Structures are given as C-alpha cells and as structure tokens.
Regions:
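A structural signal for short hydrophobic beta-strand segments in well-ordered beta-sheet cores
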Residues: 6-9
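Buried hydrophobic positions in well-ordered alpha/beta secondary-structure cores of metabolic enzymes
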Residues: 18-20, 36, 48, 78, ...
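C-terminal helix-coil-helix/basic helical segment that borders enzyme active sites and/or dimer interfaces
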Residues: 157-202
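Extended amphipathic alpha-helical scaffold segments
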Residues: 20, 125-129, 163-170
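A short core secondary-structure module
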Residues: 15, 19-59
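Glycine-rich beta->alpha junctions and the first turn(s) of the following alpha-helix
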Residues: 58-160, 197
Length: 207
C-alpha cells in the first residue's frame, strides 16, 4: 500500500489534483465517496476522501467474484481530479496511519463474521446429529459426536469472547492493535477447526 502510484499534485490554492487508478475498490460501482491513497508530489503517502461527483472520477468494470457478491468491487479511475484541501484525511505524509487503522477494523470484522459462521455450523451439527439414527439411536448419543460438538461449542464461545473484548478495546480507543490481529488469527483458525468438525459429524451429506 505504501508503494501507491496514484499521484497527488499540490496546487497553489491548497487543493490537490489526483491522477491514477485504484484497484479492488469496495462498493466502487455505487459508493458516493471513496478513501483513496496517493503520494503528494510523488513522495508523501497521504489519504483523501474522493467524492463521486468530482470531475474526472470514473468507475471501471465490475469484478466477478466467487464470494462477497453482495459487495460491488470495481477499479476507480482518477483523471485530473481536483480535490479540495478539506478532503485531505489526516495530515500530508500520514496516510499510513489511516491505512493501518482501516486494516485493524477489517480484521475485527473478520473475527465477528467467523463467529456467525461457527454458530451456524454448530447449530447444523446439533440438528443433524439429533435427527440421524444409527444402531437404534441418534448419533448425538455417541461419545465421539458429543466430544466433537462440545469442542465446537468451546471454540465458538472462545471466539465470541475475543470478539466482544476487541469491540470493547475499540470503543475505549486503547489502540490494542495486537489484540485485534490476534482476534482475526484465532477466529480464522477456530472457524477452520469448526468447519472441519462439522464434516466429521455429518459425513459426506454436508458436501
């Protein structure tokens, strides 16, 4: 990100003229405003709020993705876009602060979304194991299945606790970046473990 090629030329009136193309812009097809990173005078990495109504702002071709289809993803093309000084986000040369903060919130949201996926997998496992019968009884009565579901419960609520703790840290503005990173990593690992466990409960029918 710090190697951004989009150029922002400072003007005498304090405004900036931006030229470049930004890839993979979330909601690029319909958003009214974008956060764009550019190098002022080719050197100082800075963040700007770009409004769709600015002359020279165009959206590129929609990306066709395997997942996250509810979000429009397009390039945003900037051709001699004049941006007023008030649309500078933070300070010139301090855009990395904005960029890394965005990543922290993204990691937190990843942890929260995996928590929902895990709860869904847990519910499906409990339902299926109660419905499927082998040897005259539900497979939920078998020790191996009980162990798997119990392990899923423990992991799921460990994720939930970490997500709520991270939310509290963000609300308190304590800047615990390491906790946010840890939440995303642990949640991703635990979700993988839980999704693997549901396969062991449901067998090939899950596929």
């Amino acid at each position: 990100a710090l190697g951004a090629k989009t150029h922002a030329a400072r003007q005498d009136d304090g405004s900036y003229v931006l030229n470049g193309e930004k890839m993979w812009i979330t909601n690029g097809g319909f958003a009214d405003a974008f956060i764009v990173f550019a190098k002022v005078d080719g050197e100082q990495f800075s963040a700007f709020i770009i409004e769709r109504g600015f002359d020279g702002v165009m959206s590129g071709q929609e990306e066709h993705k395997m997942g996250l289809v509810g979000s429009s993803t397009t390039p945003v093309i900037l051709q001699d876009v004049r941006v007023p000084a008030k649309n500078l986000l933070g300070e010139v040369g301090r855009g990395h602060k904005v960029a890394f903060n965005v990543l922290n919130y993204g990691r937190f949201k990843l942890g929260a979304s995996t928590m929902g996926s895990c709860k869904l997998a847990l519910g499906e496992s409990a339902r299926y194991s109660a419905e499927r019968h082998q040897f005259g009884q539900p497979i939920a009565n078998f020790g191996a299945i009980k162990h798997k579901i119990g392990e899923m419960v423990t992991r799921t609520y460990a994720i939930e606790s970490m997500v709520f703790r991270t939310a509290g840290l963000l609300d308190a503005m304590l800047g615990e970046h390491k906790s946010i990173d840890d939440a995303a990593l642990v949640a991703a690992l635990e979700e993988y473990a839980i999704e693997s466990s549901i396969l062991k409960v449901t067998g090939s029918e899950y596929l």
